[in-house]
Amino acid sequence: MLTKRIIPCIDVDLDEDGNPAVYTGINFEDLEYTGDPVEMAKQYNMAGADEFVFLDITASAVGRETMLETVSRVADEIFIPLTVGGGIRTRDDIKSTLRAGADKVSINTAALETPELITTGASAFGSQCIVISVDARRRFDEQGENYLSVDGESCWFECTVKGGREGTGIDVLEWVTEAETRGAGELFINSIDADGTQDGYDIPLTSAVCDAVSTPVIASSGCGSPADMHEVFTEAGADAGLAASIFHFGEYSIEATKEYLDERGVPIRT
């Protein structure tokens, strides 16, 4: 059985002085300064993280290039796989980000706007380098294609872009199957509804995606405890659990999380 991965993630933006800084928020809003990206990456590397995710959260929205200098500094300090997302729009952007030290790139907005980018990237650099990120939001209307029962109500999940700021009308389950067909090596599923709440992952969303594809799925948003990771692994079938707040603020350590999962029979990397 494949081991499950524990992945801390930092959301990076420019502070008032134009310096890269880590921010944490709720539902993609109310962002608060959390720390320095390079220092936090070093700490997670030493803490036993299986991988590390660096997301430039405003590059796509404002049309700015990804912070490649900061990516390089992070890559120099860690010895675990590094995924970088935000502002990646072209084949050259993928190439530049990988050259800066990333092992994988996470693409959201550009892939939805130009799906051929997935095919091109996978062909040029290998599917293992191409992670398709999906910022999903629940919609309780009649415009979707695949409906799920969530808390007694029928809803569908819409792909959003520009850091969750804009809807697309595209059904998440339709999109992930297309992304897989085009060569995506992993799917990074963010729930805007669960983001930062620490109330648990969006199990209906994650489970539906895992059922729809065979590509590895990284569950993101809402983790508040090791029990939430246990649930998303055992109930939804996720291959990896991403978390931010619970690790950033020291509520739980990666070591304690792995011990909790191991004691309950979840295969993890030691």
From Swiss-Prot:
Pathway: Amino-acid biosynthesis; L-histidine biosynthesis; L-histidine from 5-phospho-alpha-D-ribose 1-diphosphate: step 5/9. IGPS catalyzes the conversion of PRFAR and glutamine to IGP, AICAR and glutamate. The HisF subunit catalyzes the cyclization activity that produces IGP and AICAR from PRFAR using the ammonia provided by the HisH subunit. PANTHER family: IMIDAZOLE GLYCEROL PHOSPHATE SYNTHASE HISHF (PTHR21235:SF2), IMIDAZOLE GLYCEROL PHOSPHATE SYNTHASE SUBUNIT HISF/H IGP SYNTHASE SUBUNIT HISF/H (PTHR21235). GO terms for molecular function: imidazoleglycerol-phosphate synthase activity; lyase activity. GO terms for cellular component: cytoplasm. Heterodimer of HisH and HisF. Pfam families: His_biosynth. HAMAP family: HisF. The active site is at D11, D135. It catalyses: 5-[(5-phospho-1-deoxy-D-ribulos-1-ylimino)methylamino]-1-(5-phospho-beta-D-ribosyl)imidazole-4-carboxamide + L-glutamine = D-erythro-1-(imidazol-4-yl)glycerol 3-phosphate + 5-amino-1-(5-phospho-beta-D-ribosyl)imidazole-4-carboxamide + L-glutamate + H(+). This is Imidazole glycerol phosphate synthase subunit HisF. The keyword Cytoplasm applies. Signal peptide: none annotated. One of its GO terms (biological process) is L-histidine biosynthetic process. It is found in: Cytoplasm. Keywords: Amino-acid biosynthesis, Cytoplasm, Histidine biosynthesis, Lyase. InterPro entries: Aldolase_TIM, His_biosynth, HisF, IGPS_HisA/HisF, RibuloseP-bd_barrel. Its EC number is 4.3.2.10.
